[in-house]
Swiss-Prot record:
GO CC field: cytosol
Note: CTPSs have evolved a hybrid strategy for distinguishing between UTP and CTP. The overlapping regions of the product feedback inhibitory and substrate sites recognize a common feature in both compounds, the triphosphate moiety. To differentiate isosteric substrate and product pyrimidine rings, an additional pocket far from the expected kinase/ligase catalytic site, specifically recognizes the cytosine and ribose portions of the product inhibitor.
Protein name in UniProt: CTP synthase
Protein residues bound to L-glutamine: G353, L381, G382, M383, Q384, E404, R471
Amino acid sequence: MTKFIFVTGGVVSSLGKGIAAASIAAILESRGLNVTMLKLDPYINVDPGTMSPFQHGEVFVTDDGAETDLDLGHYERFIDSTMTRRNSFSTGQVYENVIAKERRGDYLGGTVQVIPHITDEIKRRIHEGAAGYDVAIVEIGGTVGDIESLPFLEAIRQMRSQLGRNNTLFAHLSYVPYIAAAGEIKTKPTQHTVKEMLSIGLQPDILICRMDRKMPADERRKIALFCNVEERAIVGSYDVDSIYECPEMLHDQGIDNIITEQLQLNVQQADLTAWKKIVHAVKNPKHTVKIAMVGKYVDLTESYKSLIEALKHAGIHTETDVQITFVDSESIEKNKGDVSVLKDMDAILVPGGFGSRGVEGKIAAVRYARENNVPYLGICLGMQIALIEYARDVAGLKGANSTEFDLKCAAPVVALIDEWQTADGSVETRDESADLGGTMRLGAQEVELKAGSLAVKIYGSGHIRERHRHRYEVNNNYVSALEQAGLVIGGVSAGRERLVETIELPNHPWFFACQFHPEFTSNPRKGHPLFTAFVKAALNNKKA
């Protein structure tokens, strides 16, 4: 029978529930358990796919093509399980399914209500996502006390009642602030958030206290007394230099022993050797490189969370401190293409994105990298930008652009394809009037690499599988002209469309761009060959 750990948060949002939950999962996995994780989001959007990065941060894409919360990225980076669409759902999805059932007549004319119909749907989805695993860690988004979270909290209350204390555990993350003016740690916010939980029938079994320092014994005893939680189950989650220190930090306070005792799990002791090696590599780099990330969401770096982590992973595997400088592509555009900010950089990366804002600034960055032999990595839009720049400045295609930015451009080298074959062989279609939600090329796709290409050298294989999230493609009508001008198409989709997947420049020290998102499959234990190769290229450029 699957055991459930429910992780909730109180006082304020953005405390790091996802990291805490993933760290617990990593510890339990090291004890030999088969662990999965679920994220329940209270917003009414069906998924975050159409939400602004400024509102939501990164949209993480699963292997089967679900657009999900960035916390699923943390889950995959911390444990070996691969997330799917079953590992994430929102209020919007729950209501959508319940309403569809009502329209079909599944409820036999009954009145459809939050309890039991919505809560039953939530429980069904939790059980569905957890099926086949020893332990399922379920993170409830939002903050306890919010109206939006109430159906989810009621659902997990019912699960405790139905499954019992030995099959369910509540871990609540709370903020314990230090008031500098008074020189005191304040426990009152934690007392109040636990009071809020108790009012809806939830008693925390573990309290994880988010702090900027280690918790003194007096405060631990005080919280235990007033919150009716065992003193040993008051666990500090304090600021650390790297999130990959968190599993060891929580393990050192015995959190996994509390969990295994309550859930009656007879398992081996934790072995965090791999995590200790990762932390040692993070803290003891032998080299340093400066990489410019040129994008338009630089004011909210959470928009590039997986990308930032993938570069850090490459740093771990090359013993390198990867220092990222975020460059606003709009500022380059406004300064008439001035790229002087890039002159001290060892490499340049243009990430994915949507819309025309800042595009010309990104094109200027690509031009600088190409003309000055600076290692360049383009991802998704970053590949399309590189291709547009090459088409204009090398191939001589006047008016080259993407129809995303200029529907009537003279040379649409990037355009919206209206039909393509999915991984399962089915055919999907779309046009300019199609809904934005769920109409992209999403999830893992097969890619065939060209023999002798840089792509094959990087991956060590002629066939790879990478995740995608995009709506526009390289226009195959222009591929021949671009190849004649010296551009190498290093990879194409395995389907009948033969869509361009990677491009490279043969006479450049290291210039590579891909249509897919390799950052979604990088983790600190293994890294990813593309990012490792990119950081090595940056190191070589620095030495040169």
